[in-house]
Amino acid sequence: MKPLFVFECDLVEGRQVRCMDINQANPDLVVVGYGEFDINCTDDSKLKPGLLCFWTLKNPNFPEKIINHEASITCCQFSKKAPHLVAVGDSSGNIAIYNIRGNDTKPVAESKDLDFKHTDIVWDIQWVQRENKGESLISISGDGKIIEWSLRKGLEYTELMQLKRETNPNQKDVYAGAEIEKKSGGMTFINTGGLSIDFPQNSEQNITYFAATEDCTIHMCSMSYSEQYLETYSGHTGPIYRVRCNPFWHKDDCPIFLTCSYDWTVRVWSAKEPNPKLTCHQIETLKQQVNDIYWSPNTSSVFASVANDGRIEIWDLKKDNLAPVKTYFDKDSDGKEINTAKTVVRFSRNSPVLLAGSENGKVGVYRTLGLEHVQVSERD
């Protein structure tokens, strides 16, 4: 990997990079969401508001557009059907839609004034094309709710699922925010928080999806059933920060998906097997939570991960599932490793470039060397 340049400006000082997405219609356009987070702060009004910056790979010196947002931004994604729209989720539980055409920086729709909305942090969002419904937005939150938002008339909601805690034999006293009902015989855990959501890209109707939770499990769910899971996957021993489906692999309608966790591991799963197929980590050196993962858009066996000690790793499952093919740390002027936590990672869609955001507000842009492009057979 070779560092090219860094997206940074004075406006993002004191904020962390929390999310990032690349526009499908214009692959040089990158949206980055920023926020200030302090686990010891009980009053969000004392924290800096969120910031949405639109950078381009052709002009890294300053954002093309800047949008101020009331609360810290936790997730963002461009619409696939209307790439001038970008959806945002934040630390207050609000969903907002922005139109980046023109000079207006106010949201065209948002959920904060609705009677029904998320009551906790929105951790992940996904635009999904629904049969006979057009494109809708799906959100998952720490309140345990998964909600579908329609933009036909402002924002209209449909609750898809209230996540319930499942018994996890791998869990070791990690209950992370689950709602508890006290009973005479002890404690019964009812709801659990959701942290990430993704849809297999081969699904014709986009009915099936995967939800990662605070209680260390992943659930395969259907948009047609709100009362039960289709399958539950156990293997992690800490909250699962991200779940991402492989964009190529859909043999026998059996998605392959990745997860990363507080437990220092990245795991590879087959939808037909409730236990992980592979566990990817460096046994001797990786003792840090893995904050994000992202599949390569060009090669079906390649993905990137970033961890809390500042490392960027590139993996190729065809070559090795126990060690990455490349581990990279930023370095200071003296050549020493910089251990600022990396929070987000993305591959560029149209060039051999990787982007990684950090908790110091910087987004590093790197050239990836030696990665092969996908063969036609890998898409089948």
Question: Whereabouts are the PLM-identified features?
Answer:
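Acidic and/or Ser/Thr-rich intrinsically disordered tails and linkers
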Residues: M1-G50, F54, K106-A109, E135-S136, ...
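Structural WD40 beta-propeller signal
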Residues: N23-A25, S79-K81, V128-R130, P200-N202, ...
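Conserved, structured regulatory domains from eukaryotic proteins
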Residues: G50-N61, I66, A71-M187, Y294-S296, ...
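Conserved blade-ending motifs and adjacent loop-strand segments that build the rim/top face
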Residues: D115-V122, Y233-R242, K277-Y294, N321-R349, ...
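Loop/turn-rich, solvent-exposed surfaces of beta-rich toroidal or solenoidal domains
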Residues: K251, V268, K287-D320
